[in-house]
């Protein structure tokens, strides 16, 4: 288990972020309620922007920031993943003009948060994701991870972009 803080209070996750070289396979739900698997992204680098909810300020900022950066990334998909219902994700993207990243939900696939080690097991956000970044190579293997130490802080966007 890993530990971060939520408003300065220590909280724990179900596990650790995957080690470099680990193959990540997943199925998630798109905004139209269809399913998509990691196989759909093979051949591309994939940034997994994992966060608690689109309805929090920092999470919304991370989506906007990655959306702006994604327009200049070659052969790279940016997936913004939370437990939000796809309807909430679609509403946010529509209102914000988000077009360069995909928002995906694991509300039907709780195994995603187990595989990535990101589910909070205690605290006020219990059941939601810890703010983290996982970069996958074209074969779906982990090449970079970041577990943000304080949930209310943004991830290091430049660090993951540099790893591309």
Show the residue positions of the predicted features.
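Chalcogenol-based redox active-site neighborhoods
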Residues: 1-164
């Amino acid at each position: 288990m890993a530990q971060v803080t939520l408003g300065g209070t220590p909280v724990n996750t179900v596990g650790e972020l995957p080690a470099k070289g680990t193959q990540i396979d997943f199925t998630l739900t798109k905004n139209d309620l269809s399913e998509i698997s990691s196989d759909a992204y093979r051949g591309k680098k994939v940034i997994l922007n994992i966060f608690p909810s689109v309805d929090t300020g920092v999470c919304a900022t991370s989506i906007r920031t990655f959306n702006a950066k994604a327009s200049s990334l070659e052969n790279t998909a940016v997936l913004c993943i939370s437990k939000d219902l796809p309807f909430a994700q679609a509403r946010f993207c529509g209102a914000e003009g988000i077009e360069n990243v995909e928002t995906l939900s694991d509300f039907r696939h709780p195994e995603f948060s187990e595989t990535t080690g990101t589910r909070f097991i205690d605290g006020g956000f219990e059941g939601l994701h810890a703010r983290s970044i996982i970069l996958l190579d074209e074969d779906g293997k982990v090449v970079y991870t970041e577990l943000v130490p304080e949930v209310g802080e943004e991830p290091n966007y430049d660090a993951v972009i540099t790893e591309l």
